[in-house]
Amino acid sequence: MSPGRAAAVTGAVVLAAWTVLGWRLAGSGDSAPTVVEAASTVGFVGLPYVVAAMILAHRVVRAARGPDLPARVVAVATAGRPRGVDWGAALRAELAHIDGRAGRWRFAAGCVEAALVGGSGRLARATAVPVFVVFAVLTFAGSRFMLAGQRVGLLAGIYLVALAVGAVAAAVGWAGRSFRAGLVSGATALAAGLAGVVAVAAIEAVTWYQRAGVWIIDGDVPAGGIASPGAAVTDAVVGMTSFGLLFALPFPVLGAALGAAAAGAAAAVRRRVSAGSPSG
């Protein structure tokens, strides 16, 4: 299957799944679902998943070249490393001299581990703590601002987490001219940032419970009241984690693709300008 066809098929499958899910989510309330509600859910939440799935399918199929599955795994694991092209070629050449299915799979697993631990993985881990701190501080500030004002809840700003994660992935993908670097950094930023949000939200949920008696995620007052501080904390942890992942999960892929594409376009422009310049 060609990369383009793989992307189209994957996108169609994910879109169909989100169409069904969007209809179910739209009908989760007291009223019957409407086409507009389902379409808005698919467009606002599902469409990023469709595009991200198409990007991943295209890149994986394009990179997966080899005589068997271990060779394709190594090819995918070593793809997208502009500063490690020789390393990837050396690994693929070494695999070609390994006989036996078990030995080839062990080698492929080692290549995957090395690809995840080294290079862009080290950069991503180095930025995890600063990202955690920034998201935690912003969550605390947003919590206190909302508590003193309209009390709409932290869920109102959850899409900002997705955009910030996408921005990190795009910046790293552009700077490193690598989709892989952007993807790894974006995924790490998502994990670290969401951890910062959830950690602070869990603590602040008790403050919202004590001062206003409302849920921190949406500012709603439950009919029977909040049973205990523990219930407020559980709602904050489960709600912010689930909605954070729901909205932000595709954005490391989208940001990395955008950053790498922008870097590639800029490099192509520079090459054309250099080729058109008169030689001294």
Indicate where each model-derived feature is located.
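Membrane-interfacial hairpin junctions
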Residues: 24-38, 147-149, 183, 191
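Hydrophobic alpha-helical transmembrane segments
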Residues: 31-47, 156, 224-259
